[in-house]
């Protein structure tokens, strides 16, 4: 049975698989051409990036990772809103980087396209203390990261209300 719920969950599953793959082409293929990815942590930095900005910045981020695992923390906690075409995922990552281990937890809210086969919008929430620790270690090793990297990388406006 190919219900809306089934299609939403299948797309969310592919989203998670592409994040774990660290394959930027696969990561962007699951997204619509107009997808916006909102980083939603006001105590750290709020910003939104386009697919082009993701493609541009990703190689620099990937270069810091030597081993990576990403996945859903608890399948029973996945929430689906069929009418809004949204799926919420609680996920975790465990990575070895050029400056030591990095572990974090995330909540992703994915809004799918009308056909439920691609992601139109991503809201990402994460533990800012853990990310800040990684950033400090990267900076101490003189490794630029993310939006502070020297690559041409500008952000769009803050995310709209969920």
Curated annotation (Swiss-Prot):
Disruption phenotype: Impairs the synthesis of austinol and dehydroaustinol and accumulates the intermediate compound preaustinoid A3.
Pathway this chain belongs to: Secondary metabolite biosynthesis; terpenoid biosynthesis
One example of a Gene Ontology biological process annotation: terpenoid biosynthetic process
Regions that span the bilayer: none
Domain of life: Eukaryota
InterPro entries in the record: Fungal_Meroterpenoid_Isomerase
Gene3D superfamilies xrefs: 3.10.450.50
Function summary: Part of the gene cluster B that mediates the biosynthesis of austinol and dehydroaustinol, two fungal meroterpenoids. The first step of the pathway is the synthesis of 3,5-dimethylorsellinic acid by the polyketide synthase ausA. 3,5-dimethylorsellinic acid is then prenylated by the polyprenyl transferase ausN. Further epoxidation by the FAD-dependent monooxygenase ausM and cyclization by the probable terpene cyclase ausL lead to the formation of protoaustinoid A.
Assembly behavior: Homodimer.
The family this protein is said to belong to: Belongs to the trt14 isomerase family.
Something else known: In A.calidoustus, the austinoid gene cluster lies on a contiguous DNA region, while clusters from E.nidulans and P.brasilianum are split in their respective genomes. Genetic rearrangements provoked variability among the clusters and E.nidulans produces the least number of austionoid derivatives with the end products austinol and dehydroaustinol, while P.brasilianum can produce until acetoxydehydroaustin, and A.calidoustus produces the highest number of identified derivatives.
Protein name in the entry: Austinoid biosynthesis clusters protein J
Species, as recorded: Emericella nidulans (strain FGSC A4 / ATCC 38163 / CBS 112.46 / NRRL 194 / M139) (Aspergillus nidulans)
């Amino acid at each position: 049975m190919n219900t809306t719920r089934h299609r939403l969950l299948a797309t969310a599953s592919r989203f998670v698989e592409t994040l774990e793959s660290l394959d930027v082409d696969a990561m962007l293929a699951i997204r619509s051409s107009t997808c916006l990815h909102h980083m939603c942590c006001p105590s750290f930095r709020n910003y939104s990036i386009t697919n082009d900005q993701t493609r541009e910045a990703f190689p620099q981020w990937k270069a810091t990772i030597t081993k990576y695992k990403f996945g859903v923390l608890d399948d029973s906690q996945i929430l689906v809103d069929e009418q809004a075409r949204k799926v919420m995922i609680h996920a975790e990552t465990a990575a070895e980087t050029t400056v030591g281990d990095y572990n974090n937890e995330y909540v992703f809210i994915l809004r799918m396209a009308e056909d439920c086969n691609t992601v139109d919008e991503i809201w990402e929430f994460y533990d800012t203390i853990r990310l800040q620790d990684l950033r400090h270690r990267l900076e101490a090793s003189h490794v630029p990261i993310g939006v502070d990297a020297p690559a041409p990388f500008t952000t769009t406006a803050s995310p709209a209300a969920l």
